[in-house]
Amino acid sequence: MTYRLEFDARALKEWQKLGDTVRLQFKKKLAQVIINPRVEANRLHSLPDCYKIKLRSSGYRLVYQVIEQEVTVFVVAVDKRERELDYRKAEDRLG
């Protein structure tokens, strides 16, 4: 089953600010995520039904929430991996 991909409005703005290379890397990972969104190794324990995608080379993270009743992968935050800012943004937006 393939999940639908949606963005929080603020996450979409963050996405649009990314460079082309970083965006392409995330697109490749998201293509895998919409097929199999629940990867246990990427689960965030502090946020319910949330998972992360890490781009180690560029230092970016993307946080998404799996919404089963809507069969949706919902992107909550995209940001640099600095002082856990990406996780704090996700927590505030889901809060």
What residue ranges belong to the model's regions?
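Enriched for short, Lys/Arg-rich terminal
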Residues: 2-4, 12-13, 17, 24, ...
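Solvent-exposed, charged interface segments at domain starts and junctions
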Residues: 1-2, 41
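A short, surface-exposed loop/turn module that caps and links secondary-structure elements
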Residues: 31-55
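Compact soluble domain cores
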Residues: 21-33
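Short, conserved clusters of charged catalytic residues that mark active-site
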Residues: 10, 25, 45-48
